[in-house]
């Protein structure tokens, strides 16, 4: 009885000691749980990560190739023969010693999965390592017709905003009655600054839709374009002026997407030659070694309901003198 009393007395005198012991057990338990979860996460990433381009350690050339092929599964042109084609390709790569050894096979397989608008680019050919495009839009106002030369564009976010703002600033003025958008020789690049700069001419509706091979669709509106560049959203309605768009055989890719943003509008007419026929949507993948995969994953549906799958956009007026005929049409519209 005396010992029990002494024990109780000691417990009453040292409650802090007992609390520390409990806290220590709790902390050790939490630490153990964290370590277990961390181990599971590492195991998960080690096993599944390569399929998504995530590597905890430098991948072998074979694992590198398999991670690229996993992405190619989403290519627009993969069909019933695709599984056999990629199996043969991976067998060829079993003897690869370096990442560079895989490039020729992956380049060929990329074209098979994504068609002519798809590219496997080595680190040396990565667009991010290329000089930025020095092209900037050209603006002229002649006889109340606003001439906008819209060239190809590649560059960072700051350059994209500058490109777009040069076009939008010209369109904010009230000293014109018609607009001529010249997309001849625009071979593409980034469509967002092109369309964003011209956005005040466009209605805030679906400009076009990406259509994936499983049938799902993703619409792009004027607001989506502006949001992508971080530019100010406006509720202003599209300017109702006659618009002529000029095209030729070098109007391609993002240049063609800019044409489609206008095609089908009642105040727009397209003059020139059929475009370059790169009318599909691409996904951009940065690969482990700095190479890049540009993969076509969707066809394009315009506002008229026409589906494009690397088909040329036909002008409304087929002509070898698009500028002269466009000017004549615009002046006629202005006089009405």
Language-model features, listed with the residues they occupy:
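STAS-typified acidic loop motif
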Residues: 135-161
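Short acidic catalytic loops
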Residues: 148-149, 170-189, 245-246
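A short, well-ordered alpha-helical element
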Residues: 156-177
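Membrane-interface motif at the C-terminal end of an N-terminal transmembrane signal
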Residues: 37-57
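Gly/Ser/Thr-rich loop/hinge elements
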Residues: 188-242, 280-286, 297-301, 307-308
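N-terminal Sec-pathway targeting helices
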Residues: 18-42
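Terminal peptide-recognition signature
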Residues: 68, 109, 148, 181, ...
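Extended, small/polar residue-biased N-terminal targeting/export presequences
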Residues: 76-143
């Amino acid at each position: 009885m005396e010992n029990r009393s002494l024990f109780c007395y000691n417990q009453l005198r040292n409650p802090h000691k007992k609390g520390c012991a409990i806290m220590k057990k709790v902390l050790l338990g939490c630490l153990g749980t964290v370590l277990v979860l961390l181990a599971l996460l590492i195991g998960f990433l080690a096993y599944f990560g390569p399929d998504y381009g995530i590597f905890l350690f430098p991948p072998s050339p074979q694992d590198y190739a398999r991670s690229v092929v996993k992405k190619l599964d989403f290519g627009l042109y993969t069909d019933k023969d695709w599984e056999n084609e990629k199996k043969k390709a991976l067998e060829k790569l079993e003897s690869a010693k370096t990442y560079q050894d895989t490039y020729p096979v992956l380049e060929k397989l990329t074209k098979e999965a994504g068609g002519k608008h798809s590219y496997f680019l080595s680190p040396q050919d990565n667009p991010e390592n290329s000089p930025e495009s020095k092209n900037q839009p050209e603006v002229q106002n002649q006889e109340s017709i606003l001439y906008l030369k819209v060239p190809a564009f590649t560059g960072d976010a700051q350059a994209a905003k500058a490109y777009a703002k040069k076009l939008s600033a010209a369109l904010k003025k009230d000293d014109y009655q018609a607009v001529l958008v010249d997309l001849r020789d625009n071979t593409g690049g980034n469509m967002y600054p092109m369309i964003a700069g011209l956005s005040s001419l466009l209605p805030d509706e679906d400009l076009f839709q990406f259509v994936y091979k499983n049938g799902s669709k993703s619409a792009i509106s004027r607001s989506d374009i502006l949001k992508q560049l971080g530019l100010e959203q406006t509720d202003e309605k599209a300017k109702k002026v006659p618009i002529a768009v000029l095209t030729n055989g070098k109007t391609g890719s993002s240049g063609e997407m800019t044409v489609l943003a206008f095609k089908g509008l009642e105040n727009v007419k397209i003059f020139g030659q059929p475009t370059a026929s790169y009318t599909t949507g691409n996904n951009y993948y940065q690969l482990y070694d700095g190479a890049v995969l540009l993969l076509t994953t969707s066809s394009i549906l315009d506002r008229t309901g026409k589906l494009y799958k690397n088909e040329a956009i036909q002008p409304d007026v087929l002509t070898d003198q698009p500028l002269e005929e466009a000017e004549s049409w615009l002046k006629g519209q202005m006089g009405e």
